[in-house]
Amino acid sequence: MLRGNEAEGVVVAGRKSEDEVSLVPLLPIAAQGGSLNDFVVSVKENDCERVVSPIRGADFAMPVAGDSMAPEYPAGSQIFIKKINERAFIDWGKVYVLDTCNGSVIKRVFPSDNAEKVKCVSINPEYPPFEVSYEDIYGMYRVLLCMSVK
């Protein structure tokens, strides 16, 4: 995912001045709603288009691909995410994007029986849960908002 400087995403409701609107990088890779693949992508911030964040605190936006997180996070929707320190605190049961050595994936995250891993669970029951080792996670991003066309 994003390597280098990270933008701050703060939007002040009701403000129309361009100086007061928050633009966040739209990552040119999708969070896979499925299982991890073997594709590693490194993105530089200046390679990213910027989009207006409709929510305070978002660091990045990215598209969702696949249907494992449908219907809440359908393919083609755009999510706004915030980087967290996964070593300090994880809000178990919430949806995160995990940037891993095998690609980026969007999943509901739970503790694993193995203290060195997290359990990733899809909303769509057709997709089985899987585990990811902390050492394979480059970053965890809490999903703050999902926008989709209805």
What are these regions, as identified by a protein language model?
Residues 1-75, 85-88, 147-150:
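Short, positionally conserved secondary-structure boundary motifs
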Residues 55-150:
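Acidic/glycine-rich C-terminal interaction modules and beta/coil loop segments
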